[in-house]
Amino acid sequence: MDTNNGNAGKAFKLSVATLAIMNITAVVSLRGLPAEAIYGPSSAFYYLFAAIVFLIPTAMVAAELAAMFSDKQGGVFRWVGEAFGARTGFLAIWLQWIESTIWYPTVLTFGAVSLAYIGMDGASDAALASNKVFTLITVLAIYWIATFIAMKGLSWVGKISKWGGMIGTIIPAGLLIILGIVYILSGGHNYMDMSQGFFPDLTKLDNIVLASSIFLFYAGMEMMGVHVMDVNNPSRNYPKAIIIGSLATVAIFVLGTFALGFIIPAKDINLTQSLLIGFDNYFRYFHLSWAGPVIAVALMFGVLASVLTWVAGPSKGIFTVGKAGYLPPFFQKTNSHGVQRNILLVQGGIVTLLSLLFVVMPSVQSFYQILSQLTILLYLIMYMLMFAAAIVLRYKMKDTPRPFRLGKGNGLMWFLGAVGFGGSLLAFVLSFIPPGQIQTGSNAVWYSVLIIGCVVMVVIPYIIYAMRKPSWKDPSADIAPFHWEKGTEQQK
């Protein structure tokens, strides 16, 4: 946006409240609430801890980087590449894309459960939600429908995403919290063990593995950094919007988690079904059983909108970078709508293969958890690269204008970067430990999938980078050279 275009530019400035709401809608999702409801009151500690050491540092650091390179495409590829070279920059954008690809089956599993609960018989719905074949077919059907819609272009994506976010996330979140509050005030039995207290037992590592998944709850906040220059007085108003949005996000997560804990005993919580079961229990208590299928449809629509947004997002990012010579011509093909057709098809193939893990995992729940952990691991690697790059660029590009700067000196950047990097590293290590609360099958399968998955997904972009050829570069590519490159010659 041209901010120098007189009143026209000012008309498009975002208010603090608007940006805060955008932050909330970009991050909030309900599907992960059951994983934290297991922890009872201590879940609030995990949400707050992750917000302090991850959510806020991510939003603030990404804001400086986004403003610094607002006139250049590439996102994390640009940020990391300027600090550590094109090879590592390609690794960062690759991880952002591949983790979202691996994430699809997990969020779609939740979508399949929502579809199962459209019926009126709770027992039959639960049995259907646990059926591997039903879940597999539903996951693939929803994903390929989302891909087909994405192929039609951004106009379709925008319409469905806009309404899906409101109908499938914001309204159900508010309803869940209201139901929980009214339930307790009306004398309903509280199944949450309040004696556990706010602080968890941090000496038991296997008890905090699920808590590391909270970092994935907050993932994606770096994408909001592109709006840093869309507010008046960004040095004052952007941090204010981030703080307000972060506090509201934490409040929604905490209250939503407590609402589930109030109505479902911890021992009965299921990662994939408990959100729907919680709604059903509340509706029965208030004699509103007819509303169960309605909320299931709404959540299902929200899943479709969420997947559609991500199908069209990270794949577009790696497509743009690929045209600059980092991907073979096959991956640069588009359809008549200008959509990255071949990347979407390859992405769909990966999702289909991953979904077949249903047949080797002991349950839908274990499949959901292990893929969630792999997604977290890959995304955290990207975040560690981003935090490290932000600090390094304070020295490599110290004279480059920063429209939004964290502090006058380097102290605040060091603090936020170190806190974010340290928090990401801690969550990365914890994510390898099998959770004690969930049956994930053989530990050998758990470690094999996570370790081999991480190694393979990190090595692949290095292989692609080593094999690149001059003929891969599209003359129409709009990726500016890095500051350390001479002219437009890429690093060899």
What function would you assign to each model-found segment?
Residues 3, 134-186, 219, 242-247, ...:
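Membrane-interface loop-to-helix entry segments
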